[in-house]
Amino acid sequence: MFSHITVLKEESVNGLAVKPGGVYVDCTLGGGGHSERILTALAGEGHLYAFDQDEAALSFAAEKLSRFKENITFIRSNFRHIKEELRMRGVDKVDGILFDLGVSSPQLDEASRGFSYHQDAPLDMRMDQSASLTAREVVNTWPFAKLHSIISRYGEEKFSKQIARKIEAYRLKQPIETTGELVDIIKEAIPAPARRAGGHPAKRTFQAIRIAVNDELGAFEDALTDGFELLNEGGRMAVITFHSLEDRLCKQMFKEKTKLPDLPKGLPIIPADQKAPFALITKKPIVANDEEIKANNRARSAKLRIIEKEKQTD
């Protein structure tokens, strides 16, 4: 069964300042929790466009949100195609965009999807089941240097070199087929004292491979870039991240958008007349409270950042 606990639901949707009659985008439909809250705030007016790559998520959400069917359009696509998908539907501008970058709980928990290091399953990790690249291909065919690079960069794993070497040595004997095999290889590569410290020893490597399989950071950067352009003046973007790589990218891109525009030297401009194209609504990220973390431990690492497109004076 598809079930998913929505993280920072009230904070993120309230942060969008949804107005009845507006046009909004939920880039990560998942279980439909955020979409349901946005549609409720729209009060039967306006429209929501909801993206997801996962057919199971779309089917579940379509049934869950059936009472809002006149006000929602479901789009099966990676959110990196937000601009093209909306333009195909005659939409050039929107009033708010939401990203929840957590992998949805059903994907993590369903063994057959190959995301979980707690359950043995074929190596897959594709968000979009129609995509060609799988975790099996990454683990068995990517050269040592590339494996080392992604495990280090995307997993921020201290033992990335040792893990990549161990994978390389193992696959010379036979292909690595399952998540269980990969977990055992990772455990062998990490020194015993380090294995006993912190979380699961395979967590960072699995994260790295998942990000690589789905090009998550590249897709996120593309979607943010197009999202800024799509927003109406006064429109807002809310982003929930779950690990430092996503949060760093979001923070950096938000910072760039809130800088004053570059002006030619010597131009007689009064500083007060200069205006950045965007303004930060959250000076520091909003995090889950103790009550939410107690109910859903995955909320512990969630960070919410919100930005607004400024109204430009002529």
Swiss-Prot record:
It catalyses: cytidine(1402) in 16S rRNA + S-adenosyl-L-methionine = N(4)-methylcytidine(1402) in 16S rRNA + S-adenosyl-L-homocysteine + H(+). Keywords: Cytoplasm, Methyltransferase, rRNA processing, S-adenosyl-L-methionine, Transferase. It comes from Shouchella clausii (strain KSM-K16). GO terms for biological process: rRNA base methylation. This is Ribosomal RNA small subunit methyltransferase H. Its EC number is 2.1.1.199. S-adenosyl-L-methionine binds at residues 32-34, 52, 79, 100, 107. Belongs to the methyltransferase superfamily. RsmH family. GO terms for cellular component: cytoplasm. It is an enzyme of class 2 (transferase). Specifically methylates the N4 position of cytidine in position 1402 (C1402) of 16S rRNA. GO terms for molecular function: rRNA (cytosine-N4-)-methyltransferase activity. It is found in: Cytoplasm.
